[in-house]
Amino acid sequence: MEEQKPKGSGMEKIATFIVDKRNLFFLLYAFALIFSIVATGWVKVENDITTYLPEDTETRQGLTVMNDNFVTYGTARVMVSNVTYETAENICSDLESIDGVTSVDFDDTTDHYKSASALFSVTFDGTTTDDISVHALHTIRDMLAGYDTYIDTEVGVDTSADLQSEMSVILVLAAIVIVLVLTLTSRSYAEVPVLIMTFGAAALLNMGTNFLCGTISFISNSVTVILQLALAIDYAIILCHRFSDEHETKDTREACIAALSKAIPEISSSSLTTISGLGALAFMHFGIGRDMATVLIKAILFSLLSVFTLMPGLLMVFSKKIDATRHKNLIPKITFLGKFDVATRFIVPPIFAVVVVVTAVLANKCPYCYSYTDLVTAKQSESQIAHQKIKNTFGVNNMVAVIVPTGDYDSERQLLKDLDSRAEVKSTQGLANIDAMDGYKLADALTPRQMSELAGLDYEVAEALYAAYAVDQNEYGKLISGLGDYKVPLFDMFMFLQREMKDGNITLDGDIQETLDDLFEQLNKAQLQLQSDKYSRLVVYLNLPEESDETMDFLDTMHALIAKYYSSDTYIVGNSTNVKDLSSSFGEDNLLISVLSALFVVIILLFTFKSAGLPVLLIVVIQGSIWINFSVPTIQHESLYFLGYLIVNSIQMGANIDYAIVISSHYSDLKKEMRPKEAIIAALNEAFPTIFTSGTILAVAGALIGVMTTNPVIAAIGTCLGRGTVISIVLVMAVLPQILLIGDTIVERTSFDVKVPVDLSRVNRTASGNMRVSGRVRGYVNGVIDAEIKGTLNGTLNASVTSGTTIEPTKPDFYLPESKEQAAAEWAENYTEGEEV
């Protein structure tokens, strides 16, 4: 045979470079993976979901002010059941004696003793992460080991570490399922390690580059690996199957090059819907969406990179093993389902329409919640069990902090009084209402005479102390007019006295000094928690749940009460205000994600199928699956954490739509060769292995996350994702085929095509003799052909065909005028490469 060597296309050149330079890529990946292993330790994880609230929300602003100005000591609610009150009193004394415990609140009221159960409110000497608090908590656990004890606290709780431990177990179980699924759907057992290594590299690269994002959320840190696997495993499978097909007629290298050059555009196109769905998350006002979109899209891109640059080399290395371990197709044909779909094509769509309308209404009434404190997960941690036990016995403990400008004790006192008078308030605490001694409060203003009587000082000593205070505050007028009526808040005077004693300006007798030292220690802790140079913090305990309409209304009432005394620079901070801020932005975020994810996908499908009708049909099916998915919580009367809806909505639209695309693509191709009814049956058989692989992995991953994690946010995402994927699979297999059959007319009438002029420069090869041809050929062939043909023939066919081959008249892509056909044929026959066209 004589043949001029062709010039490869741009994609073929890229594929050739990747395959031929595979050892270079292996080396680069080795360095990159080593770096990623090290860099995973650099990733900072944010466990506080309120960090991602918009900057203009009250909760976000209030938390910033509170964290910058106050210290919040660790606390614990310790419930001991089946004890007498006398035993409880002894336990209280033992708890107070523990090093690291500041105070223990316990009395005989029903707030602390009920139904033979005692509730101790413990305050520690340090914050929730300080060693002194953690050690004290361990001591409490050891001390109460013999009792029926429940401890609800955030002290020593590392949410990120606990979640990572749970996700590691989930990942192992998911990996086992994935290996089984890949084994069933693979064509060779040796393909499985290639797929696993490709994905493992992509996952590690993504984790190792998360530090570039600065700080990522605990949600992204925990679920990305599993979602990356479930969403991107298809890419590796596509290339693997392409290689298997090409390897039947080509040697390993040529097969790998051909497979990669064809797979790159196919896989890239497939990934666009997933990326667009995830991209919609980035437009959320709630910053967690941007965080997840960044990490997950990065994961998809690394998956593409690994499939395009690492997997070809692995296929070359494992090619002999792949050939040696080939097995028969283990996935059965589902012709029976296809026949069912054909038979019910006029029955199922109307039923589906009714179901969609009903579930859309139910989904719109889904009982969303914005606080996960009281959510019950399938698997519960010790802390969650304790929280529920204490809640069921003693009720809720809903605390909010009111932050106001400092310096006006009278306004603080009056505000606390107004709040205490409300039935919705259990108790309040602030410097203005903390008892000092002899009936005085810490913020009460005393004259020198009152101070001398209270502290047991000589009047002259008290007067001298007041004079020194007046000088320190630059209030010289008081010295001139006389100090008899000069009033100073008790707290301010004690803090001034402490400073003067530290500076050595004042010395006292030993007994008084020791008493004051103990007092100063308590006052210092009170100040750190309740007062700074700019703000005062008032603590309010509500008789209301964290999340209810009544609670939201009372927050408005609190704002009105605060406005009576302060005109600006005030904040209310707590789980309830967090709920209020999240719920106010949810409606807009929900609409934004639903519209954008659907819009992005429609645009991609529009140019993929070149039909305005088909994308609408596919979107209707997937949107229907979303509505059905989120109607379930309404039917079950179970609260759904709002993030579960927002995140799964975008993933379901971006990822599950691929199942519908696979069936539609096969159907569109096959109906050119056979009748629509036969085409849809064949399309289901061809698409089922892909849908089974991807769908099973995503559904199992979601289900495992939902039932095996104790974190309510992650569990909500997993449960909704697993359920939504199963629903999507059922609909695309048992509803979409009928819709495609009866919607053919709509698809055809709304189809369009981009007119591309005939590119005669493609007629640039001539060859004669025996030859093997692989790829698309357009032109004139004169000779005997022995091949599998799938395409359009414009001319005369005289050949033997195998059973099952269909030959039907069809409209060619373009026509040459009859007068031009012979001239074109003669020109092509005499054309030589390089000749000017």
Q: What is each PLM-predicted segment?
A:
Residues 1-47, 101, 128-371, 546, ...:
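Membrane-embedded transmembrane helical bundles of large multi-pass transporters/channels
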Residues 52-54, 58, 69-75, 83, ...:
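Juxtamembrane segments of multi-pass membrane proteins
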Residues 393-397, 423, 519-520, 528-534, ...:
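A structural signal for short secondary-structure junctions
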Residues 74-82, 92, 107-164, 398-406, ...:
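A short beta-strand structural signal in non-transmembrane regions
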Residues 56-61, 68-69, 81-123, 158-161, ...:
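Extracytoplasmic
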Residues 43-57, 367-380, 498-513:
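Acidic/glycine-enriched edge-of-secondary-structure segments
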Residues 2-4, 8-30, 37-41, 56, ...:
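Structural signature of multi-pass, alpha-helical inner-membrane proteins
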Residues 65, 387-391, 414-418, 522-528, ...:
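Generic recognition of flexible, low-complexity loop/linker segments
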